[in-house]
Every structure is written in structure tokens, then in C-alpha cells.
Amino acid sequence: MTAAPDATGTVNTVDAGEVAKFEAMAAEWWDLEGKFKPLHMLNPTRLDYITQQIAAEFGRDLKADAPFAGLHILDIGCGGGLLAEPMARLGADVVGADAAERNIPVAQVHAAQSGLEIDYRHTTAEAMADAGEQFDVVLNMEVVEHVVDPLGYLTACQRLLKPGGLMVCSTLNRNPKSYLMAIIGAEHVMRWLPKGTHEWSKFITPDELFDLIRQAGLDPVDRKGFVFNPLLWTWGISERDMSVNYVTASVKQV
């Protein structure tokens, strides 16, 4: 499906139904035992991948004080700020954007309570790109499977990157295992997420995502799997297993 322009002329890839799902859960973003518990469990692994990619791309020492100082980072689909806050703690100038309006005050209050300055906005990737904004890094985590036009959305993300910029994008693979784990297991058996949080038909295979990223004008440089270990009850990064959750890194040529 291709997104159509809105009244302002901006092409909007936001799916109103998907936004409504997250609006309904907005108050629970920082509840470690709430509906976002799976994301809190995954977050340290996401952060490990993100920080390593940023450090490698921009030559930063993660052991230094404020290693991301001077970097302008956009967390698109920021939710309650689970990624924006760690980026700010590492010294980055962070903008968090979300199409779900109720997420923004939740994120703002938590950042203030944490003593962090983060620019949170109720807006979309397309609107920011049309305004000419650009960033060193765009974090695009668990969003692309919720939009109506993945290519249009990724193209907006490409426009939001400065030349030489980095995009980190994670999503869910589409295969029988991901249906069993992410839909049946997470939503129906474990009840980690409300039923209907994800639509399996919107999941994207790694090869499909790489193709879309290239069509959007970026160069994919890495992809890894996020793998859950039910015995240790922890997540880890896998070089090969991208059968359910996976993450990619892409760069914009100078």
C-alpha cells in the first residue's frame, strides 16, 4: 500500500489503527511489569547493538565521558523514551518523535524526573523530513512493521539523515516461527502484549527490508538477530539467527 498526501501535502505513512493501539497503552511505558515488559527485557540488547554501531560509525570511545556528545540523534516512534533517555545520558542531543500523542507527555515527565533534556514531539518522520530537519543518527526501532507504506516511511528516514549518517532499524521477520513466537506466544500464551498488537502480514523478511532500504537511498552495512533464551530469560545478539527479531544498520553516502 502506498500512502497518500494529507491536507498539508505531506505524504503520511502513519496507520491510524496502529497509533490507537499504542495510545491505549501510553501510561504503561515505564511499568517494568506492564504491557511493555517485553520491550524492557529487550532494551539492553537493543542498546548494546545501537551504541556499538554508533561508536564504530563515528569513531567514539564508549568508555569516555559523554561519548555521543555533538551527535544529533532522532528516535522515531520513541514511545515513552526507552531509547531516547540512554542516548541523552551518553551525551547526544536527542529528539524523540511519535505519532501517538499520548506517548509524548509520558516521555516528557519521565525525562524531567530523570534530569534529562530531550526534545519530545508529537509528529511524524514525513513531517520532519518535509521541514528539512536532518540528524547524524536515526533510530527506527520496531516501527516499520506498523506503517502503511514501508518504502515511503524508510525514504522519509533517509531524508532525515545527514550525508554520512546512520540509521538503525529493527523489526520482525515473517515466517511460521515468528507467527508462533510473536503472535501466538507473546500475545496469546504469555500475554506479554495485548492481542492484536502486531499483524503478522506486516512483518518483513531481512532480505525484503534490505531491498527497501536500498530503494530508499541507503546502503545496508550490517544485520543481526535478537534472540530470546527462555532458559536464562534473557536476550542476546546472534550473527545468524534472524528468524524472529532482527536489526539492521544502514548509512547514507556522503
From Swiss-Prot:
This is Ubiquinone biosynthesis O-methyltransferase. GO terms for molecular function: 2-polyprenyl-6-hydroxyphenol methylase activity; 3-demethylubiquinol 3-O-methyltransferase activity; polyprenyldihydroxybenzoate methyltransferase activity. SUPFAM superfamilies: S-adenosyl-L-methionine-dependent methyltransferases. GO terms for biological process: methylation. S-adenosyl-L-methionine binds at residues 46, 77, 98, 141. It comes from Jannaschia sp. (strain CCS1). The keyword Methyltransferase applies. Its EC number is 2.1.1.222, 2.1.1.64.
